[in-house]
Amino acid sequence: MFCPFCSEQETKVIDSRLVAEGQQVRRRRECMVCHERFTTFESAELVMPRVIKRDGSREPFNEDKLRAGLQRALEKRPVSTEKVEQCILSLKSQLRATGEREVSSELLGNLIMKALKELDKVAYVRFASVYRSFEDIREFGEEIARLGD
């Protein structure tokens, strides 16, 4: 790595530590020429698959959109922010594990519903009602009945 002070290429790692819950490595480096010290952060570049929407259009995976959808479904429910963040990490991991460059919005929606079913059943029904476009109260009842099975 190049020294940010003198642009020399030869630097030495003098300390490494895991940070960000093990998602990054913090390294203290020293330039072998000017002896200045600096910090670098290293993390894996994990490429998320693109999402193929119902109309056939494609868009990049949007973590903020996922978070907003989960928060909307979980509004006024007793689920901690920490659990929501764990859910997001798990969903992203499942998407990457498909090994595909593109995934359907249907697959993503089903993964979200499965996660919400385990997290909070009321939030699951809220999300399912929008995702599956429930037309009347009967469809709500059928979904709630399936939860009891």
UniProtKB/Swiss-Prot annotation:
Q: Which domain of life is it from?
A: Bacteria
Which residues are connected by disulfide bridges in this protein?
none
Q: Enumerate the spans annotated as ATP-cone domain.
A: 49-139
| InterPro entries according to UniProt | ATP-cone_dom, NrdR-like_N, RNR_NrdR-like
Kindly state which keywords UniProt assigns to this record, in alphabetical order.
ATP-binding, DNA-binding, Metal-binding, Nucleotide-binding, Repressor, Transcription, Transcription regulation, Zinc, Zinc-finger
Q: Name one GO molecular function term.
A: ATP binding
Cofactors named for this entry: Zn(2+)
Please state the residue ranges covered by unnamed zinc fingers. Answer: 3-34
Free-text cofactor note? Binds 1 zinc ion.
| GO biological process per UniProt | negative regulation of DNA-templated transcription
Could you tell me what this protein does? Negatively regulates transcription of bacterial ribonucleotide reductase nrd genes and operons by binding to NrdR-boxes.
Q: Which family does it belong to?
A: Belongs to the NrdR family.
Tell me what this protein is called.
Transcriptional repressor NrdR
Organism source for this protein? Alteromonas mediterranea (strain DSM 17117 / CIP 110805 / LMG 28347 / Deep ecotype)
